[in-house]
Amino acid sequence: QGAEGGGHTGSVPTSVLLPQVVDAVKVPVVAAGGFFDGRGLLAALAYGAQGIAMGTRFLMSTDNKVPRATLERYVNAKDVEKIQVSYLVDGMPQRMIPNEYLAMLEKASPLTRLRLALRLAQRYKAQTGMTSAHALKVFWQGLREDAGSVAQTVMAANAPMLLQRSMIEGNPAEGVMAAGQVAALINRLASCQEIIDGIITQARERRAALMAISAAGGSHV
């Protein structure tokens, strides 16, 4: 998966990463990061991949059970540059649709962010049934292994709780919305069947157009 995807796999774009992987391994390769239509599928096949994986495209589907208020935030995200990677949620890199909560985190002091993380950790502990003894054990284990990981341990509950707010409770302003950059290029929700059929049709059309150019002598492809 290239950097265009969820942002947790590094900064190398798919167009650079994919040919490296295809040349390096002897197993089927499925490309991910930045794919949402037939043109991307055809490009991935041309690079040598056997197919593509899509997260954001299928998330933005009418078959999805995500509340409509949250899906509307995805559809309305039109600026690719604003769908940025952030470390503020749980200390790990992830790409997200901008919203009020992220804007607040960016302006908050480290102490405020820690207080918010502790509050979410308490909710996570209550929902998962984790005992206080188990929570303390995890905390002290992190402290022994790496004092710097304590903050990471405290923040670990942020992502699932904030995703719950937006993806389950339907409150996109107070949660987080993970996304690939292609969210800015998807103008409407569609069923999974429509998405797949549209990708196949477009890929075939683009392949036919390339073949026509080659047959007409307009290219050395």
Each language-model region and where it sits:
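Short secondary-structure boundary segments
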Residues: 1-2, 56
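Conserved active-site-proximal phosphate/metal-binding subdomains
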Residues: 8-25, 36-221
